[in-house]
């Protein structure tokens, strides 16, 4: 199946390269025209082909998986009209990250945090609770690894776009395996892992890789995707986690239609 990753501004480059490393056939579309030359060179090095415009889909055949951010200002109909004969599957960036990480994290507790306010403070309260488990953290304050109580800054200036969950995991891998050749897939180190838990803050929903999804609140249900969607609709993805902790006011107002066996409200 062909994969088309839309939006190379908010983590699409990482998603494209990660899919390519898994042997997928990947195309990418820089909808905002912000692709940096270094990122373009990386995509070219991995064999990711860039589309000039969605009208290029007219030359495609068969199945096509569209991977898009939840704030994309295009509907599925607006995309598929470029070639109505294709068999489309649509995945959010969040869902794509979960698929990319399908073989990661089964043996450790993982918490994903989303919401309008209180995400970062919730992450660091959870860090204090889980500190004995050497948590790996992605938050708006950076990608951080805690090892025996010692804070290791992996990257300071990193956004909480879902693709940076994979980036944070990769950064921690490099710390644990300094002599490995990741790009070639040849590991010379011992493939050690320095963390025993993970806490990931994510904007506009969660990937579903977490054992627990925490929704702090919907204090403001702002519009996204050029008013075609809202914050509450995007953050509905929290219910993809097997266990969910959701602020009761948010649940009652926006998600009362959701039946989830692992739901707890607060």
Predicted features by range, described:
Residues 23-26, 39-53, 80-91, 135, ...:
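Active-site regions of enzymes building and remodeling cell-envelope glycoconjugates
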Residues 97-143, 149-150:
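Walker A (P-loop) phosphate-binding motif
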Residues 1, 20-21, 44-45, 57-64, ...:
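Flexible, charged surface loops at secondary-structure boundaries
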Residues 187-201, 205-266:
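Acidic, Mg2+-coordinating active-site environments of NTP-dependent enzymes
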Residues 5, 25-30, 50-51, 65-68, ...:
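Short, hydrophobic beta-strand segments that form beta-sheet elements in well-ordered domains
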Residues 1-112:
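Short, basic phosphate-binding NTP loop
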């Amino acid at each position: 199946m062909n994969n088309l990753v839309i939006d190379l501004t908010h983590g699409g480059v990482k998603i494209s390269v990660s899919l390519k490393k898994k042997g997928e056939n990947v195309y990418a579309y820089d909808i905002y025209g912000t692709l940096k030359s270094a990122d373009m060179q990386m995509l070219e090095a991995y064999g990711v082909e860039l589309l000039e415009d969605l009208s290029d889909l007219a030359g495609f055949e068969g199945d096509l998986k569209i991977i898009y951010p939840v704030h994309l200002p295009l509907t599925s109909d607006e995309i598929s009209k470029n070639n109505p004969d294709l068999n489309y599957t649509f995945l959010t960036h969040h869902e794509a990250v979960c698929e990319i990480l399908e073989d990661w994290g089964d043996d450790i507790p993982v918490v994903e945090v989303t919401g309008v306010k209180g995400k970062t403070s919730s992450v660091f309260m959870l860090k204090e609770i889980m500190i004995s488990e050497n948590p790996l953290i992605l938050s708006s304050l950076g990608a951080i690894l805690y090892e025996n109580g010692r804070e290791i800054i992996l990257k300071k200036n990193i956004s909480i776009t879902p693709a940076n969950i994979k980036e944070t995991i990769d950064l921690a891998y490099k710390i644990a395996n300094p002599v490995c050749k990741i790009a070639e897939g040849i590991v010379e180190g011992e493939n050690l892992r320095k963390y025993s838990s993970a806490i990931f803050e994510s904007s506009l929903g969660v990937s579903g890789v977490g054992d627990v999804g925490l929704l702090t609140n919907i204090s403001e249900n702002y519009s996204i995707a050029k008013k075609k969607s809202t914050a509450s609709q995007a953050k509905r993805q929290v219910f993809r986690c097997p266990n969910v902790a959701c602020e009761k006011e948010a649940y009652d107002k926006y998600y009362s239609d959701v039946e989830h066996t692992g739901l707890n409200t607060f």
